[in-house]
């Protein structure tokens, strides 16, 4: 299944992506997005964004793709709870601790392995699947042959970044 996935840094770009026919959007949560200097969504803005997208039949994936330190765990837990309350469709993560905490708080929410997890082989895709990820985001440095080998290795969604 193909999916047109668009990055969104603010409501303006989100509205444009939905209007242009995106099937899904991904956006940054205000504290745990790797794009710290970009516009990211507060908890309140996230609720509005998800409501608008779901009304339009568009999925919303939230990036929680920073490396997290112990002192940040309470804030991360609150961010995960806020995203769950907003009814996001998946998290995109790179830190296994974030994946674990997400599973503890909202076990039913799909996890996507960020390109920062560097799943670059069939073995990596198989491991991601075994760890409960539903999708792996493959890096742009992979060849078509490598991508084919990964996609044929196991039943996990693949996304090309």
Model regions and ranges:
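Non-catalytic helical/linker scaffolds that mediate oligomerization, partner binding
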Residues: 1-161
């Amino acid at each position: 299944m193909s999916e047109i996935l668009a990055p969104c840094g603010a409501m303006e770009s989100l509205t444009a992506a939905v209007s242009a026919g995106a099937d899904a959007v991904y956006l940054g949560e205000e504290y745990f997005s790797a794009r710290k200097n970009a516009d990211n969504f507060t908890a309140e803005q996230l609720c509005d964004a998800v409501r608008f997208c779901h009304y339009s039949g568009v999925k919303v994936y939230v990036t929680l793709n920073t490396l997290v330190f112990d002192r940040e765990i309470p804030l991360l837990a609150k961010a995960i709870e806020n995203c769950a309350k907003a009814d996001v469709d998946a998290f995109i993560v790179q830190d296994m601790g974030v994946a674990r905490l997400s599973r503890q708080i909202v076990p039913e929410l799909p996890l996507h392995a960020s390109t920062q997890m560097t799943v670059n082989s069939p073995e990596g895709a198989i491991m991601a699947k075994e760890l409960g990820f539903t999708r792996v985001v493959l890096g742009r440095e992979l060849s078509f042959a490598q991508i084919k080998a990964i996609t044929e290795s196991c039943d996990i969604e693949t996304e090309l970044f």
